[in-house]
Amino acid sequence: MGIITNIAVQTKNPERFNVSIQKENGETLVFSVDQDVLLQFRLKKGMKIDEHSFQQIVYADEVKKTYHQALYFLSYRMRSEQEVVDYLKKKGASESIIDDVLHKLRENKYVDDREFAFAYVRTQKQTTAKGPYVIRKELEKLGVAEEWIEQSLAIYSFDEQVETAKSLYEKAKKQRAKQSLRQWKYQIGQLLYRKGFPQEVIDRVLLSERDEKEEQEWEALEYQGRKAHRRYEKYNSPMYEQKMKQALYRKGFPLEMIEQFLDKLKEGDKR
C-alpha cells in the first residue's frame, strides 16, 4: 500500500486529522480520521500501511463518524433502538456499521429500550390523554420488545386510567348535543375506545356518571320530541303516536320515557 508521510490536525475540526500516504506507485493518498482512530491504530509518520490495515482504519473511522451522528440524534430526547437504526439508515450507514454503533451505544447506556419504554409511558400518562392501548401501539411502532412494553405499561394503573378517561369525558360533556343517554353513552364510549382505553375503564366512567344524566336525558327527549311533533302532527292520532314512538326510539330514548313525553303533550294540548 504505502508509507505515512504526514499527519496534520484539521483547521476546522481539531478532533480529526489528515493522513498522507505515499503509495508504492508514487501517488499520494490523503484521507482523514478521528483522533480516537488515530490513537487506536497508533498511526505515525513513517509507518507502513498495507491494504488490509487501510480498510480497517477506514471502517473504524466510519463507525466513529456514524457514532457521532447517533449521539447527535440522541441529544434531543431518548430514542428507541429502532429509531436510531432508522435514522442511521437514512444517513446511508451500512448494516454492519449500524450493528457496531448500536453495540457501542448500549455499552455506554445511550440506548436502553427498557428504560426508554418506562420513560415513554410515564411521559404519555402525565402529559397526554392516551389510554394504554394507544401507548402500546406507539411503542410497538417504535420497535420496543413486547417484554418491555408489558412491564412499562404496568405503571399506568387502573385508577390513573379511569381519572384520565374521566377528564376526557368532562371535556366532551361540555359539547354534548341534545342526544339520548343511549346515544351519548355510545358516543363517549367510542371516543374513549379510540383514545386507547380498555372496556373496563370505559364501563367504570360511564357507570360513575349515570346518576346525573336523568335530567339531561329528559331535556334531550323534549328537544327531539318537539322536533318530531312538528314533523308528524299532521297525522291522525294512532299514526301520529306510532311515528313519534318510532322516531324517538331510534334516537335511543327508552319507550317508557317516550310515553311519558307523549302524555305530557296531550295534557298540555300541544296537538
UniProtKB/Swiss-Prot annotation:
CC annotations in GO: cytoplasm
Keyword Transcription attributed: no
Keywords in alphabetical order: Cytoplasm
The UniProt record lists the keyword Hydrolase: no
Principal subcellular localization: cytoplasm
Protein location: Cytoplasm
One Gene Ontology biological process: regulation of DNA repair
Pfam families, per the entry: RecX_HTH1, RecX_HTH2, RecX_HTH3
Highest taxon in the source lineage: Bacteria
Family classification: Belongs to the RecX family.
Protein's job: Modulates RecA activity.
Protein name: Regulatory protein RecX
